[in-house]
Design a protein with these regions (language model features):
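Conserved beta-strand/loop scaffold segments within soluble protein domains that form the structured core
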Residues: 24-28, 35-178, 182
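Short, Gly/Pro- and small/polar-rich lid/capping loops
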Residues: 1-41
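Ser/Thr-centric signal marking residues that sit
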Residues: 185
Length: 185
């Protein structure tokens, strides 16, 4: 288990409702680097080899399980770009808890651009929770720019629950959703 500093623990408590732990399926990204991750029986997380980010594979036997993928930035002047791709098999029922917190006590802008793409199979149920939060007594801006691409299969449900808690100076959100529509019979 990786020992987390007080700033990271405090930010995680806010963006993950005191529920992040280094058990089950999880990946914690801190200051541009994945510092710890774990898999479960039905959820596997793999580091990308061609660009920063992870691929999350959720098998069809997943039933009510949660996966945590928070990001914490605590260095002033940092820009973090990450590509996370989710592959949800037919029939899966999963809760994905993301979120980003920036602690900026410096004078330079800190920024996180998270590009998340969801490939959801048929008859699946996905709940995606994303919270954004900023803190720190510095004058540097706290900027979060999420991009969410959602491709939903037949008879699937995708719930997007996003909140900006406080302390974020600027956000541009982009969301694209393509939903399978059955042909009339």
């Amino acid at each position: 288990m990786v020992k987390l500093d007080n700033v990271t623990e405090g930010v995680l408590d806010v963006i993950n409702d005191n529920k992040f732990s280094q058990t089950g399926a999880f990946n914690l990204r801190e200051n541009g680097t994945s510092i710890c991750h774990g898999d479960s029986e039905h959820i596997k997380i793999k580091k990308k080899t061609d660009k920063p980010g992870i691929d999350i594979y959720i098998d069809g036997k997943t039933d009510g399980e949660a996966v945590y993928i928070p990001v914490v930035l605590s260095k002033s002047g940092m820009t973090d770009l990450v590509y996370n791709d989710f592959y949800v098999e037919d029939g899966a029922d999963v809760r994905i808890v993301a979120g980003c917190g920036i602690h900026n006590s410096g004078c330079n802008e800190s920024r996180h651009d998270g590009i998340h793409t969801f490939h959801v199979g048929k008859n699946a149920n996905v709940r995606y929770e994303e919270k954004h939060y900023g803190e720190g007594n510095g004058t540097g801006a706290r900027v979060l720019n999420p991009v969410t691409n959602i491709f939903v299969g037949e008879n699937s449900v995708f719930t997007l629950d996003t909140a900006q808690i406080k302390g974020v100076d600027s956000t541009v959100r982009e969301t694209l959703s393509l939903i399978h529509i059955s042909e009339p019979t």
